[in-house]
Amino acid sequence: MAMLRTDLEFSMLPKLGTRPVRWRIADGLVAYEAAVEMMEREVAAIGEGGDELVWLVEHPPLYTAGTSANASDLVQPDRFPVFATGRGGEYTYHGPGQRVAYVMLDLKRRRQDVRAFVAALEEVVIRTLDMMNVRGERREDRVGVWVRRPEKPLLPDGTMAEDKIAALGIRLRKWVTFHGLSLNVDPDLDHFSGIVPCGISTYGVTSLVDLGLPVMMADVDIRLRAAFETVFGETTNDA
């Protein structure tokens, strides 16, 4: 259960002259196909010099399969719609009560380092959780953000139980990023049982509400934006 080294470099502040990142929050539930179409349009525009964008959404219940997904990890294929996606990673769940942040940035304006970008997304989640007195942690062999659960039984190898609270999956096109992260605020955790989340069966899944924090999505969004700005720089409201 080794943590990543503490000197991990994740700064993704923009170069001088870069315009603020547009910050957009969707109303209601967004169909996955519509989200992908929106990302495709935005990524093309950003690649041509348009302003970068972070888009916060919630989806209806669905599963997505990343480029490394193993068919055997889709335990209940008929439970919810399943979408193949070009992001990295394996199967994951999206649904109401989960904040999905689609992060569309031009790394040529920042730092052309994919590993640092992934670490930066993890850092945004870790700092968001810290504002709510939750300790999120990285793991060397598992992408995402994890929470230790000392109240749960030990794992078979004798180590402390851990649950995943945030998942990451990204894709790049000409150094423009899309897809992003999902943070479990108050989703129905039983919905994760239809898959082996991210191909990892040893560990569970948790949420802020599951951890005893009855937070509202709007409160999480405020903290998420503040954390994002410390890692990626200034944002501006987008219609």
Curated annotation (Swiss-Prot):
Q: Which GO terms describe its molecular function?
A: lipoyl(octanoyl) transferase activity
| List of residues binding substrate | R87, G88, G89, E90, Y91, T92, Y93, H94, A167, L168, G169, G180, L181, S182
Active-site residues from the entry: C198 (acyl-thioester intermediate)
What EC numbers are recorded for this enzyme? 2.3.1.181
Extract the InterPro entries matched here: aa-tRNA-synth_II/BPL/LPL (IPR045864), BPL_LPL_catalytic (IPR004143), Octanoyltransferase (IPR000544), Octanoyltransferase_CS (IPR020605)
Keyword entries, A-Z: Acyltransferase, Cytoplasm, Transferase
- NCBIfam families cross-referenced by the UniProt entry: lipB, PRK14341.1, PRK14345.1
Remarks, miscellaneous: In the reaction, the free carboxyl group of octanoic acid is attached via an amide linkage to the epsilon-amino group of a specific lysine residue of lipoyl domains of lipoate-dependent enzymes.
Q: What is this protein called?
A: Octanoyltransferase
